[in-house]
Regions:
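Acetyl-CoA-dependent GNAT
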Residues: 5-9, 16-92, 103-105, 109, ...
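Conserved N-terminal entry element of GNAT/NAT acetyltransferase domains
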Residues: 1-12, 156-168
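Short glycine/proline-centered loop/turn elements that form peptide/ligand docking sites
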Residues: 99, 103, 124-128, 142-149
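Active-site acidic-Proline motif in GNAT/NAT acetyltransferases
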Residues: 90-96, 124
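Conserved GNAT acetyl-CoA-binding A-motif
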Residues: 110-123
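Conserved catalytic-core motifs of GNAT/GCN5-like acyltransferases
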Residues: 119-121, 133-153
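Amphipathic alpha-helical recognition patches that constitute DNA-binding helices
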Residues: 13, 83, 117, 125
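Conserved hydrophobic/aromatic "anchor" residues
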Residues: 93, 129-130, 135
Length: 168
């Protein structure tokens, strides 16, 4: 498996991946109204626009895009909020560790950006996945209207990186 930055040639496969997730795994856990909103936002132009301000990654298996996820900063200059965004794995690849490796890659990118924690707006069906990856529910960020659960994971922020660098 190869994890790399998303390129323009990946836009159509990523749109298809997002739509398949909305129609498949998420359909059992979310209202039709919420899914319709997600679907409306899953356009090629939307993903191209995101590439300009997010670190968007794809995971390839045998040359095919099988997963995608992004690192976004939804905070302000003085208060960054590093967030996992648009995270999808093709359903036939669930359980193979691809999502886990992609999420670790995104966490490392956040850590490299100086983040001390990583946030994710989890869909209802993915809460267990994120819990296994070290995230916990952040009750301070309710978002029931969008049928998502905000979760947070501590990272090795700059202070921890400095301590590790000082060790022999």
């Amino acid at each position: 498996m190869l994890i790399r930055r998303m390129e323009d040639r990946d836009v159509e496969p990523v749109v298809e991946l997002a739509l398949a997730n909305y129609d498949g795994v998420m359909a059992e856990h979310h209202s039709a109204e919420i899914l319709a909103g997600f679907r409306a936002d899953a356009t090629p132009q939307s993903f191209r626009d995101q590439m300009a301000w997010k670190q968007v990654f794809v995971a390839e298996e045998a040359g095919d895009v099988v997963a995608t996820g992004a690192l976004a900063d939804f905070g302000s200059a003085g208060a960054p909020k590093h967030t996992v965004s648009q995270f999808y794995v093709r359903s036939e690849f669930h359980g193979r560790g691809i999502g886990t490796r992609l999420l670790a890659h995104i966490a490392e990118a956040a850590n490299s950006a100086g983040a001390d924690r990583l946030h994710v707006p989890s869909s209802r069906n993915a809460i267990g996945f994120y819990e296994r990856a070290g995230f916990s529910v952040d009750s301070g960020q309710p978002d029931a209207a969008l049928e998502i659960t905000w979760m947070t994971k501590p990272l090795r922020g700059p202070a921890e990186q400095a301590r590790r660098a000082d060790r022999p």
